[in-house]
Design a protein with these regions (language model features):
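ATP-binding N-terminal substructure of ATP-dependent carboxylate-amine bond-forming enzymes
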Residues: 1-106
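Short beta->alpha connector loops
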Residues: 12-14, 85-87, 139-140, 165, ...
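Short, glycine/acidic-enriched loop or turn micro-motifs at the edges of active sites
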Residues: 41, 152, 185
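Short loop/helix-cap segments at secondary-structure boundaries that form the rim of catalytic
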Residues: 42-50, 139-144, 170-173
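Short secondary-structure boundary segments
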Residues: 84, 150, 182
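A conserved helix-loop-beta module that forms one wall/lid of the active-site cleft
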Residues: 99-165
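Phosphate-binding site of ATP-dependent enzymes
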Residues: 163-188
Length: 188
């Protein structure tokens, strides 16, 4: 039997996305449901518009994949829609486990996720395909303004717009995860 139920992970505030899947799914299968997961279902607005919001741990938890597999079995899930970048690699790595249950996981290949999760790899990929990116800046001989961001960052955390030497602190200079790049003004 074909499984039409959908699971949207880390639903959070994704009310529009959840409603869009519910509305579209209803046109094809009136009995199908859209489930959501979140670490804090009571604080996840999308959970209130889904058919059910199920509490799960952070995607880095040892039991995360097993819990999702269990949810897929119990709720007859046919499609998983991840919504945060940190879930992509773990789901890509475990794609076959889901496919064995007849579940499609909407993620690219592990190799492509690895390119996207590391901004150094992303830059090399883009340049190899003829797409210009901001130039790297030597942090010990900087040209201002510059922009520093973690190569593996997410959610705009630990971003630094640096306009003058005194803003380039030792903490920033010594952070091994930061990439230093020319600042591109939005007016350009």
């Amino acid at each position: 039997m074909k499984q039409h139920n959908i699971l949207i992970t880390s639903a959070g505030k994704r009310v529009v996305l959840t409603r869009a899947f519910k509305d579209t799914l209803a046109k094809y299968d009136s009995k199908a449901k859209v489930y959501t997961t979140d670490m804090n279902p009571e604080m996840a607005p999308a959970g209130y518009v889904s058919d059910e919001c199920i509490q799960v741990p952070r995607c880095t938890a040892d039991n995360y994949v097993e819990l999702l597999l269990q949810i897929c079995k119990e709720k007859s899930i046919g499609l998983i829609i991840p919504t945060i970048d940190t879930e992509l690699l773990i789901l890509a790595i475990n794609r076959l486990k889901f496919e064995e249950l007849g579940v499609v996981v909407s993620v690219p290949s592990m190799d492509f996720v690895a390119i996207c999760r590391d901004k150094r790899n992303t830059g090399q990929f883009l340049e190899a395909h003829g797409i210009r990116i901001p130039a790297e800046v030597d942090k010990y001989n900087p040209v201002f303004p510059l922009f520093a961001k973690p190569y593996d960052g997410s959610l705009s955390a630990n971003l630094h717009y640096i306009t003058k030497p005194e803003e380039l602190t030792d903490d920033i200079l010594n952070d091994p995860k930061l990439l230093f790049m020319e600042y591109i003004d939005k007016k350009v």
